[in-house]
Amino acid sequence: VTXPDGKNTATNA
């Protein structure tokens, strides 16, 4: 998931 700031908020395991 990408937030409005363009940074990932979820990491794939």
UniProtKB/Swiss-Prot annotation:
Residue runs in coiled coils:
none
Biochemical pathway: Secondary metabolite metabolism; lignin degradation
Q: Which GO terms describe its molecular function?
A: diarylpropane peroxidase activity; metal ion binding
For this protein, what reaction is catalysed?
1-(3,4-dimethoxyphenyl)-2-(2-methoxyphenoxy)propane-1,3-diol + H2O2 = 3,4-dimethoxybenzaldehyde + guaiacol + glycolaldehyde + H2O; 2 (3,4-dimethoxyphenyl)methanol + H2O2 = 2 (3,4-dimethoxyphenyl)methanol radical + 2 H2O
Q: What does this protein do?
A: Depolymerization of lignin. Catalyzes the C(alpha)-C(beta) cleavage of the propyl side chains of lignin.
Task: Give the family from UniProt.
Answer: Belongs to the peroxidase family. Ligninase subfamily.
In its keyword annotation, does this UniProt entry include Cell cycle?
no
Q: Which GO terms describe its biological process?
A: hydrogen peroxide catabolic process; lignin catabolic process
Q: What is this protein called?
A: Ligninase A
From which domain of life does this come? Eukaryota
Its Enzyme Commission number(s) read 1.11.1.14
List the keywords (alphabetical).
Heme, Hydrogen peroxide, Iron, Lignin degradation, Metal-binding, Oxidoreductase, Peroxidase
